[in-house]
From Swiss-Prot:
Family, similarity comment: Belongs to the NAD(P)-dependent epimerase/dehydratase family. Dihydroflavonol-4-reductase subfamily.
A Pfam family per the record: Epimerase
InterPro entries xrefs: Epimerase_deHydtase (IPR001509), NAD(P)-bd_dom_sf (IPR036291), NAD(P)_dehydrat-like (IPR050425)
Lineage: Eukaryota, Viridiplantae, Streptophyta, Embryophyta, Tracheophyta
Source organism (scientific name): Ginkgo biloba
The protein's name: Putative anthocyanidin reductase
Top-level division of the source organism's lineage: Eukaryota
PANTHER family named in the record: ANTHOCYANIDIN REDUCTASE, NAD DEPENDENT EPIMERASE/DEHYDRATASE
Residues bound to NADP(+): 44, 51, 71-72, 91-93, 172, 176, 199-202, 214
Active site: 176
Amino acid sequence: MAPQAYPTAGQTTTVCVTGAAGFMASWLVKRLLEKGYIVHATVRDPENKAKVSHLLNLPGATDRLKLFRAELCEDGSFDAAVAGCNGVFHVATPTEFMPKDPENDLIKPAIEGTLNVLKSCTKVDSIKRVVVTSSAATVSINNSSEQNQYIDESCWTDVNFLTSQKPPGWAYPVSKTLAEQAALKYAEEHSLDVVTVIPVLVVGPAVTPTVPSSVELALSLITGDEFKMGALKGMQFVSGSISLVHIDDVCSAQIFLMEKPSAQGRYICFPVNTGIPQLAEFLSKRYPQYKVPTKFDDVPATPKLTISSQKLLDCGFSFKYGIEDIYDQAIEYMKTKGLLTC
């Protein structure tokens, strides 16, 4: 491959975003358009206006956004979308957390889909870098009972533990871990510049027509949604902590890493690492109008690990939103959706 300069914002720079109709990817498209990029966005059905109108209505979309049909597990499906691009943001991923057939419904599609995107990218000389969105589920899950664990980009989730013990939701972290490992291996074998971004619970406003499940999850202590609260507890039980990042920060980090020539490898991306008891105490004090539970007998009193974003910070990135901003904006967003009233 003989790519040119690293992508930079401007009306002559074209990038592709996969899975563009989703929560994170649609916000990423929004931010890229704001910065002046030309955006090729992949969706499953460009003609389904109910699923893509939020993209077409973004400022700048009329002149600088083009939708492409693509399917993760269809060979060559991303060829047209990445053609002529300078960079690619691979965000698309299967998100069925409780699949009936984990191997065929979630794990294989995640791996094959990622490789299909990368194979398309190797056909295009102008592509300088691919930024792959991974997950903290790829670094934080293990069978250790050790407290105060320090997690950084050198850590990998224990896939053998997950596949043997099968805790609730086990297939998703397995799919993300194996997909990221496959991406990095493919990149090395084919001299493709791939950087991975590792966020966790992404929270904030959305341009999607429906409320993102991660926002509902993060706000379950406020809304009282027992099912979502149970899932939040399960997250801490399996991964060891609750970590949060604002949607705008993670998208800014993706763009930052696309544009940063020296970026390489994996980057954990979130500023807030806590546990449910600590999070509940914060929420009850900051938002006393809501009945936030503060007594928990079924979750650890403190998180067993700390996940570090130091590598990203050392690269020159800075987070704009702390926990107060994350929840202030998420609550206001839920009010606009009529899901919170005070």
